[in-house]
């Protein structure tokens, strides 16, 4: 029971006491008791309904692309934390005997600009060195994109008839890949909230209903955002004592399976 409209552009939004309406560029009008905003970090819906946000610039940019590697990725993600930012290679399916990974390389903005200016051969060489040849040489790269990184958090996730979720409500540094997990958890919480409301015959888009979703997710998201900010600063530290204690602590956590598994389940939202 889903109608998928694509491509389509929304011309205007209008919220009323009983429903929210969208007017499309072709003149069609859509109405529903609730509008769910899942339109990304630069959410048009969030801006249209005047959700206030708190945000700041990390001073980092993420270089993203697809690269071909010399060695098989074994369907395993690889990440290296460097003082200038983390480098992650995420496994993709191979094509014949060629091996591919998705790259997310977060760097201080000036260094990211320098890397973006390199030609493909120079960039592959820099990436091979940065990744410590964990998958052999980087053989080739697709077109590169540089995305400025900002932390953003909506002070409220809901107003009457409208709910924000995922990146429209919060964005964090991609150093641990937690943005998508937070978004999935938002979806699960909102689905549960709306399911309970529907079974009880309650208004799906009322502020009373939607506040239950906000009360469940906002503290969880804030806690994860704070943890990731601390994580980022910990790995950016160049102090030898801090680096020694950090590495020793991580080594001990890796050896204590219940603690390690507990952390893994926590960040996966389980």
Annotated model-derived regions:
Residues 1:
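Active-site-adjacent segment of FAD-dependent monooxygenases/related oxidoreductases
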């Amino acid at each position: 029971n889903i109608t998928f409209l694509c491509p389509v552009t929304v011309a205007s939004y209008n919220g009323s006491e009983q429903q929210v309406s969208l007017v499309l560029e072709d003149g069609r009008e859509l109405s529903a008791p609730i509008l769910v905003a899942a339109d990304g970090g630069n959410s048009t819906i969030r801006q249209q309904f005047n959700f206030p946000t708190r945000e700041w610039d990390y001073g980092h940019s993420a270089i993203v692309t697809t690269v071909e590697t010399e060695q098989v990725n074994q369907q395993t993600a690889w990440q290296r934390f460097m003082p200038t930012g983390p480098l992650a290679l995420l496994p993709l399916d191979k094509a014949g005997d060629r091996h591919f990974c998705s790259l997310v390389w977060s760097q201080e903005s000036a260094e990211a600009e320098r890397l973006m200016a390199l030609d493909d051969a120079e960039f592959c060489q820099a990436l091979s060195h940065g990744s410590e040849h964990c998958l052999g040489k980087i053989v080739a790269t697709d077109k590169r994109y540089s995305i400025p990184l900002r932390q953003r958090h909506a002070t409220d996730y809901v107003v009457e008839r409208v709910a924000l979720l995922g990146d429209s409500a919060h964005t964090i540094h991609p150093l641990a890949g937690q943005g998508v997990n937070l978004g999935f958890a938002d979806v699960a919480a909102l689905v549960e909230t709306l399911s309970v409301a529907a079974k009880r015959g309650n208004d799906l888009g009322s502020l009373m209903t939607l506040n239950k979703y906000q009360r469940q997710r906002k503290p969880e998201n804030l806690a994860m955002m704070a943890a990731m900010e601390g994580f980022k600063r910990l790995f950016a530290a160049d102090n030898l004592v801090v680096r020694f204690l950090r590495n020793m602590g991580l080594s001990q956590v890796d050896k204590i399976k219940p603690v390690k598994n507990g952390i893994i389940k926590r960040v996966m939202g389980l």
